């Protein structure tokens, strides 16, 4: 699994498709190449202290490790934003939510339409 590390990559993924799920939000963006899928993980301080945030990130990384080979598409960047519910949700449910979020993300248009001004 390749990781996103640069801020620019995270910001670029934020312009793509968002697929909310129980415990996290999945952001997906097509890069336009055939390289393997890349994943990034982020959890804000709203979720809790460092121990809780790291626990959420570990759970999200494990979900991706177990499922991304099958469901993720090459040439895409994915960012998982952890939410507080990820601390208490059963792991099996989070795995199902991840699979559903990937399906929803790939079923939507890959670019957002431009916002028209009202002038």
Can you say where each PLM-predicted feature lies in the sequence?
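Positively charged, solvent-exposed patches that mediate nucleic-acid binding
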Residues: 1-119
